[in-house]
C-alpha cells in the first residue's frame, strides 16, 4: 500500500489499492443535485478521476480547475472530481469559482469510491489526493496517489495518459 502523509503526518489508507491494468471497479457517489451517480454512467468515455480531500482548499481548488480546463480540449473525456464534501458545498464552490459545468461528486455517504480505490485516509475520514484515468473500455491506465496530501498531482502525466487512453 502506498505510504501517504497529510500535513506531514502519516495516515493509513483503507480500501483496495488499484494498479494500472486493473478493471476499474464501479462505485456509487452523489452529485450536486443529490442524485446517485456511478462510474458506469460514463461508460464509453475516458474518465479522468480527480480525487481531492476537500474542494474548498487552495491545492484542491487548483487541481479541480486545472484538470477541467486541460481536459476540455480532449475528445470523449470527462473529468470527475470526487471528495467527501457535502454536495451543497461542492455546488457552492462551483458557482463561486465560475465552473458550473465541472462534475463534482460526493463520496460522503458510504465512501464507496474511497473503499473501491484504496484512498480513504482512515484517521481523517477524507480521501487521499489522487488521480485515476480509466479508458473507454473500463481499464485503469494511470494511477497516482500523491505521497503528501498538500502537494499537487502530476497534472501533465495524468493529462497525457487521458490523451493516450
UniProtKB/Swiss-Prot annotation:
This is Thiol peroxidase. It catalyses: a hydroperoxide + [thioredoxin]-dithiol = an alcohol + [thioredoxin]-disulfide + H2O. Its EC number is 1.11.1.24. The active site is at residue 60. It is an enzyme of class 1 (oxidoreductase). Pfam families: Redoxin. CDD domains: PRX_Atyp2cys. NCBIfam families: PRK00522.1 (NF001808). It comes from Listeria innocua serovar 6a (strain ATCC BAA-680 / CLIP 11262). Disulfide bonds join 60-94. Belongs to the peroxiredoxin family. Tpx subfamily. Keywords: Antioxidant, Disulfide bond, Oxidoreductase, Peroxidase, Redox-active center. Residues 18-164 form the Thioredoxin domain. One of its GO terms (molecular function) is thioredoxin peroxidase activity. Homodimer.
Amino acid at each position: 500500500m502506498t505510504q501517504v502523509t497529510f500535513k506531514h503526518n502519516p495516515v493509513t489508507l483503507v480500501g483496495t489499492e488499484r494498479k494500472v491494468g486493473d478493471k476499474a471497479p464501479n462505485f456509487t457517489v452523489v452529485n450536486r443535485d443529490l442524485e446517485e451517480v456511478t462510474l458506469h454512467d460514463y461508460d464509453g468515455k475516458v474518465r479522468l478521476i480527480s480525487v481531492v480531500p476537500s474542494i474548498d482548499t487552495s491545492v484542491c481548488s487548483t487541481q479541480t480547475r486545472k484538470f477541467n480546463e486541460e481536459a476540455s480540449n480532449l475528445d470523449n473525456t470527462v473529468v470527475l472530481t470526487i471528495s467527501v464534501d457535502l454536495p451543497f458545498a461542492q455546488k457552492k464552490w462551483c458557482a463561486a469559482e465560475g465552473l458550473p459545468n465541472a462534475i463534482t461528486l460526493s463520496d460522503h455517504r458510504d465512501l464507496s469510491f474511497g473503499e473501491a480505490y484504496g484512498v480513504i485516509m482512515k484517521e481523517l475520514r477524507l480521501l487521499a489526493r489522487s488521480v485515476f484515468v480509466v479508458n473507454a473500455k473500463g481499464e485503469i491506465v494511470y494511477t497516482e496517489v500523491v505521497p503528501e496530501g498538500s502537494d499537487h498531482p502530476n497534472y501533465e502525466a495524468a493529462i497525457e495518459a487521458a490523451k493516450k487512453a
